[in-house]
Amino acid sequence: MSPQTETKASVGFKAGVKDYKLTYYTPDYQTKDTDILAAFRVTPQPGVPPEEAGAAVAAESSTGTWTTVWTDGLTSLDRYKGRCYRIERVIGEKDQYIAYVAYPLDLFEEGSVTNMFTSIVGNVFGFKALRALRLEDLRIPTAYIKTFQGPPHGIQVERDKLNKYGRPLLGCTIKPKLGLSAKNYGRAVYECLRGGLDFTKDDENVNSQPFMRWRDRFLFCAEAIYKSQAETGEIKGHYLNATAGTCEEMMKRAIFARELGVPIVMHDYLTGGFTANTSLAHYCRDNGLLLHIHRAMHAVIDRQKNHGMHFRVLAKALRLSGGDHIHAGTVVGKLEGEREITLGFVDLLRDDFVEQDRSRGIYFTQDWVSLPGVLPVASGGIHVWHMPALTEIFGDDSVLQFGGGTLGHPWGNAPGAVANRVALEACVQARNEGRDLAREGNEIIRQACKWSPELAAACEVWKEIRFEFKPVDTLDPDGN
């Protein structure tokens, strides 16, 4: 290197380590409509000021590294850096803070949840200066949303395809989840659909194991769908799980499902990955398939209150990546889910515009512009006695999915489906007549039992079943 070059390059550069907050903590910053905004729950190590911790998150998830480097001078850090623009103490929690970070839109590839998450929830989550870090919420700007296709079809198009209106849809996960032969599996699908369900579902564990290869399962399930449709006059579906070990194999399964003429396929979007999910969602839109999404592995990421990522962020990411249904908890069943938090991300899945509401854990106003909505699926430990509460909590635009609550009926699978359909129809009728489902729910179900022996038998079996455990992930005392 010539002396002239060396002198020019060294202007304004000082080697060494400097505090993150000198560059990345900018409390006077005015956020832009095009910024991606993030709310992080930060627990700094002892001795680390919250401003330095928040700035470190902004730096390590955008342009920063642990030391100053020569190549900082070859770009405009002010244009590309993330900025921690506000810090709030979490009431009732020692050494926890909410750090708000703004990211310039140019940091992210268009239409790529994978790239967005690689930056925002990447290596920064292992940063030693932080004891724990959790991403509570994201504000996705409309300019970025418009680079995504989103759900293959959305709520209204799905209802039109199925010709089903004015009530929640009913589903059932086939059990036992593993071990059935393809023929016996198809028989269970047929019995449930014939009994009155709209959908049946592959368990998320079911891919293509030695006891039941995927092609055999697809064929027997298609036969069950067509037979039940012919007998009931209703459009039916089974969530055929296309999740596989490679994207190529996944697409092969989706293509075969389309060739069979079935209405819907399924994907495990977290274990399968966002790149695979987005590819499948694009295929489903182009070929008229609905796409059901299971969230297997979500609790590894979202259940602990101080570290990881809240499910509302995963729900937003799914709406961008693409899916027509996604499992969203039940509030009343066996799986984690506080009511206000659950309703918050259910609205983020379905609605076009959601206002900031800290009482429901929503940190930012979110405008989805023209992106279609996603049906939330309530599934896990629910039965006929839960039907009034589920109908009242989730409303019409939802899927209520009873696995054991259908297949565990003492008279068999079809009577289990009948019991659920009768319970749902009774709740919808009562609601439409102006009755209070929250207060009168049990009485509504008891009255329906008088003209449905199948429902009466189901009510007797599950009359004592409760899952009364306090959720781990709860709102903070101030509504955070």
Swiss-Prot record:
Modified-residue entries (N-acetylproline), positions: 3
Cofactor list: Mg(2+)
A Pfam family it matches: RuBisCO_large
Residues bearing the modification N6-carboxylysine: 201
Propeptide: 1-2
Subcellular localization(s) per the UniProt record: Plastid, Chloroplast
Catalytic activity: 2 (2R)-3-phosphoglycerate + 2 H(+) = D-ribulose 1,5-bisphosphate + CO2 + H2O; D-ribulose 1,5-bisphosphate + O2 = 2-phosphoglycolate + (2R)-3-phosphoglycerate + 2 H(+)
SUPFAM superfamilies from the UniProt entry: RuBisCo, C-terminal domain (SSF51649), RuBisCO, large subunit, small (N-terminal) domain (SSF54966)
A single cellular component GO annotation: chloroplast
Molecular functions (GO terms): magnesium ion binding; monooxygenase activity; ribulose-bisphosphate carboxylase activity
EC numbers for this chain: 4.1.1.39
Keyword Oxidoreductase (UniProt): yes
Protein origin, superkingdom: Eukaryota
Residues the entry annotates as binding substrate: 123, 173, 177, 295, 327, 379
UniProt xrefs under InterPro entries: RuBisCO, RuBisCo_large_chain_AS, RuBisCO_lsu_C, RuBisCO_lsu_C_sf, RuBisCO_lsu_fd_N, RuBisCO_lsu_N_sf, RuBisCO_lsuI
Similarity section: Belongs to the RuBisCO large chain family. Type I subfamily.
Extra remark: The basic functional RuBisCO is composed of a large chain homodimer in a 'head-to-tail' conformation. In form I RuBisCO this homodimer is arranged in a barrel-like tetramer with the small subunits forming a tetrameric 'cap' on each end of the 'barrel'.
Full protein name: Ribulose bisphosphate carboxylase large chain
Organism: Ipomoea purpurea (Common morning glory)
Lineage: Eukaryota, Viridiplantae, Streptophyta, Embryophyta, Tracheophyta
Gene: rbcL
